Amino acid sequence: MNTFGTRLKFTSFGESHGVAVGCIIDGMPAGVKFDEEFLQNELDKRKGGSKFATPRKESDKAQVLSGVFEGYTTGHPIAIVVFNENAHSKDYDNLKDLFRPAHADFTYFYKYGIRDHRGGGRSSARESVARVAGGAVAAMLLCEFGICVQSGVFGIGTFVSNLKEEEFDFEFAKKSEIFCLDPKLESDFKNEILNARNSKDSVGAAVFTKVSGMLVGLGEVLYDKLDSKLAHALMGVNAVKAVEIGEGINASKMRGSCNNDALKDGKFLSNHSGGILGGISNGENLILKTYFKPTPSIFAKQESIDKFGNNLEFELKGRHDPCVGVRGSVVANAMVRLVLADCLLLNASANLNNLKNAYGLK
């Protein structure tokens, strides 16, 4: 599906080598201050063009088509479009009938009977432009409530930071070309990416996300738990293979006496749960880790088949990220923002008092 969210609905459209990529955000309340400069800055973070990302250079200039008037949201659908300006479709002519390993080529073809071979079409990470735009709009709402979502990279390949989560340096990550959270490892991270690129290969990454200023009560019970929604959103990002919340996998190795977050004087003494209990936020920081596989587009010789079942060897052309997880950190951040904004709006009608307050009733 191309639409995400319950109360705040986000729909993306467009393909890697199509005319444009964009999104529609429906359900945003009227009166939210709309910051176009912030929107553009978020899109600029996701852009390629550096030696650590795809050489494909796009201006990624956002055009807001509707839903905003005199600097504020109107309560109507917000449409944002970003035109593709630098697609090299000829690079993919030799892939028209070929299935690239670890891509969506094989599954898209057998599911739909047709696929856009130019850069992967809809399955391309180019679609994430729309997600980042939507996440930026969601952040404008979250900002009104003091909720701040920050993300960065804490692992590249076999190099993983051993810093404690509270020691991750988000200010450094803002200035880092690869959004590195550990200043001491930035050089190793960069070398790992460049070594992969120089050997016609790629490498995976690990992304850390922290949400501060959280409110109590976001999320629902059972099938719409906040952790379920976050995992759903993040697992829908290109190349993501695993998501952890709080202690994550480590919780399976712990005793309950260590994993439980005790309370004293109205405060939690720890945050092993990652800010979520029973599927509902408890007011502590949300803690998430997202793991990206190596970019499947590599330039080493590979084996595959074509749509006729013929075996063949091929070497890929085109422009691709040596580590998709670097720019993926910006996308992961956007998806968390969209989930939280949606939950924030849903919580406004979670009980009678909330509903009465919305109408000024007691």
UniProtKB/Swiss-Prot annotation:
PROSITE patterns in alphabetical order: CHORISMATE_SYNTHASE_1, CHORISMATE_SYNTHASE_2
GO biological process, one term: chorismate biosynthetic process
Molecular-function GO term, any one: FMN binding
Entry keyword Transcription: no
Catalysed reaction equations from the record: 5-O-(1-carboxyvinyl)-3-phosphoshikimate = chorismate + phosphate
Residues that bind FMN: R122, S123, S124, N238, A239, G278, K293, P294, T295, P296, S297, R319
Gene Ontology CC terms: cytosol
EC number: 4.2.3.5
Co-factor binding comment: Reduced FMN (FMNH(2)).
Pfam family, one: Chorismate_synt
InterPro entries: Chorismate_synth, Chorismate_synth_AroC_sf, Chorismate_synthase_CS
Key word Flavoprotein present: yes
Pathway annotation from the record: Metabolic intermediate biosynthesis; chorismate biosynthesis; chorismate from D-erythrose 4-phosphate and phosphoenolpyruvate: step 7/7
Source organism, top-level taxon: Bacteria
Cofactor: FMNH2
Keywords: Amino-acid biosynthesis, Aromatic amino acid biosynthesis, FAD, Flavoprotein, FMN, Lyase, NADP
Residues noted as binding NADP(+) in the record, renumbered to the chain: R46
Alphabetized Gene3D superfamilies for the sequence: Chorismate synthase AroC (3.60.150.10)
HAMAP family with a match to the protein in the record: Chorismate_synth
NCBIfam families given in the database record: aroC, PRK05382.1
Known role: This reaction introduces a second double bond into the aromatic ring system.
Quaternary structure and partners: Homotetramer.
Protein family membership: Belongs to the chorismate synthase family.
Protein name: Chorismate synthase
Source species of the chain: Campylobacter jejuni subsp. jejuni serotype O:23/36 (strain 81-176)
Lineage: Bacteria, Pseudomonadati, Campylobacterota, Epsilonproteobacteria, Campylobacterales
Gene name for this UniProt entry: aroC
